[in-house]
Amino acid sequence: MLTIPEGILLCFITSGSVLGVLGNGFILHVNCTDCVRQKFSTTGFIFTGLAISRICVICIIISDGYLKLFSPHMVASDAHIIGISYLWIITNHTSTCFATILNLFYFLKIANFSHYIFFCLKRKLNTIFIFLLGCLFISWSVAFPQTVKIFNDKMKHRNTSWKFHLHKSKFIINHILLNLGVIFFCMVAIITSFLLIISLWKHNRKMQLYVSRFKSLNTEVHLKVMKVLISFIILLILHVIGILIETLSFLRYENKLLLILGLNFSSMYPCCHSFILILANNQLKQASLKALKQFKCHKKDKDVRET
C-alpha cells in the first residue's frame, strides 16, 4: 500500500504524463499535417522526431514506474530488464539528441556573434544536424554493449547479494559510459542555450540605449526566447536529477517515495517542455488556439442539442 504523500505524488505524475502525451501528440499532429499539405521542413522534422521520442520516453517512465511499485516481481525478470533498458536507451538518447538539434537550430538562426567559427557553423547547418544524428547512432553503439555488461555483472553477483558499496566505482563508470551520449547532448544543449542567452542579452542592452521611449517588438520576442531557454535548462537539470534519484531507488527497493519522487522529476522535462514549445512557437500556438475554438464550438453545439 502507498502512503498519502506517495499517492499524491503518483496522481501528480500520472496526470502530468497524460498531459505530456497530449501535448507532444498535438505537436506531432500539427507537423504531420503540415508535411501532408506542403514540403517537409527542417523544423518540422526536428519537432516530429522530438515529439515521437518524448511520447515514448513518457510511456516508458510511467509503465516502468508502475511496474516497480505494484509488480516488482515482473521488474526483476531478465526479459523486462533487458527490454526496458534497450527501449530507454533508444528513446531517451533520441529525445535528448532532437532537443539538442532544436536548441542548436535556434542558436544559429537567432544568435549574433562576429566570430568566424559561428559563421562557419551557420553555413553548415545541415551538416551539423547530420553529424549530431551520427553521434546518436554512436551513443547507441556504446550504450548497448554497456547495458549487456551491467546485466551480466548483476547476474554474476545475483547469488552473492550484489551490494552497491562493494562496486561503487565500477557502478559509476558503467553508468557514465551508458549515458555518455546523453551527457554529450546535454552539454551541447546547455552551452548553446547559454550562448544564445548571452547574445540576446547583449542585443537587448544595445536596444535599450537606442530605443529609450518605445519598447521594440524584437526586444519582446528576445525576452520570450530567453525565458524559454532558461526554463529548458531548469527542466533538463531536473530531468537528470530525477534519473539519478531513480538510480538510487534501484539500490533501495523499499523506498517507494524516493522512486516516485524520481519519476516526478524525470517526467517533468518531456511533459512540461512540450507546452513551452507550443506557447513559444507561433505556428503551434495558432494551431492550439484554433483547436480550442473548435472544441468550444463543438461543446456549445452539443449543449444546444441536449437542451
From Swiss-Prot:
Topology, Cytoplasmic side: 29-41, 105-124, 201-227, 279-307
Gene3D superfamilies per the UniProt record, alphabetical: Rhodopsin 7-helix transmembrane proteins
Any single Gene Ontology cellular-component annotation: membrane
Segments on the Extracellular face: 1-7, 63-81, 146-179, 249-257
Localization: Membrane
Additional free-text comment from the UniProt record: Several bitter taste receptors are expressed in a single taste receptor cell.
The protein's name in its UniProt record: Taste receptor type 2 member 106
High-level lineage: Eukaryota, Metazoa, Chordata, Craniata, Vertebrata
Name of the encoding gene: Tas2r106
